[in-house]
Amino acid sequence: MSFSCPLCHQPLSREKNSYICPQRHQFDMAKEGYVNLLPVQHKRSRDPGDSAEMMQARRAFLDAGHYQPLRDAIVAQLRERLDDKATAVLDIGCGEGYYTHAFADALPEITTFGLDVSKVAIKAAAKRYPQVTFCVASSHRLPFSDTSMDAIIRIYAPCKAEELARVVKPGGWVITATPGPRHLMELKGLIYNEVHLHAPHAEQLEGFTLQQSAELCYPMRLRGDEAVALLQMTPFAWRAKPEVWQTLAAKEVFDCQTDFNIHLWQRSY
């Protein structure tokens, strides 16, 4: 399978270094190997998604292995849930591909797609991980045919439930990872006067049945520069005063707790 046209939703066919639909809408592949399927009219800003600075901080932090237990847990679920008839999986909001390439390596017989709205992140991902098929696209308008995916992975990424239901095959899976109540409490303690437990959103995915929920919690011991990179990755970075950044950078060791919720949803038959 391949992509569908983001303009007319018909299948895209690969012709040399381009994807072309029956209406002759054409999308050229970049030299790094990805394709941009985000039409200008679907952009909310000139350069949507993470900046180069945010992407580089996330890559440095993830490459150090601090979130590898989360990655390993999702890989284990994919191996357990997908049978030998599976053909395609999609990582939504894949960023620079840290999780995505592990899915591809664990499932070599399956085509692994990575999607993100950030061109900067996808360019870096495609250059580093040629075993994955990457695209720049909106998670709210997935450029894939109906019932084309055996599994979709969403790690912190938004996506309309109706799009998930449209793209996932009957009996297929959506795996989500979201922050649990105590996720990064120590980091929040440097920023906020009062730190409250994160209230997990009780998500409902129409057309899916929640088959399993699991918690993954473990401590991290970070260097100062790693703690700074972690803060840059978070949605509360913009609330951090200059002295918070300076305090973190000066630390030899910063201990912090992770708390992830992993949910497995199965598409109704």
Curated annotation (Swiss-Prot):
Keywords: Metal-binding, Methyltransferase, rRNA processing, S-adenosyl-L-methionine, Transferase, Zinc. S-adenosyl-L-methionine binds at Y67, E96, G97, H183. Pfam families: Methyltransf_25, Zn_ribbon_RlmA. Gene3D superfamilies: Vaccinia Virus protein VP39. It comes from the Bacteria. It catalyses: guanosine(745) in 23S rRNA + S-adenosyl-L-methionine = N(1)-methylguanosine(745) in 23S rRNA + S-adenosyl-L-homocysteine + H(+). Its EC number is 2.1.1.187. Disulfide bonds: none annotated. One of its GO terms (biological process) is rRNA base methylation. Zn(2+) binds at C5, C8, C21, H25. The keyword Cytoplasm does not apply. Homodimer. Belongs to the methyltransferase superfamily. RlmA family. Specifically methylates the guanosine in position 745 of 23S rRNA. This is 23S rRNA (guanine(745)-N(1))-methyltransferase. It comes from Escherichia coli (strain K12).
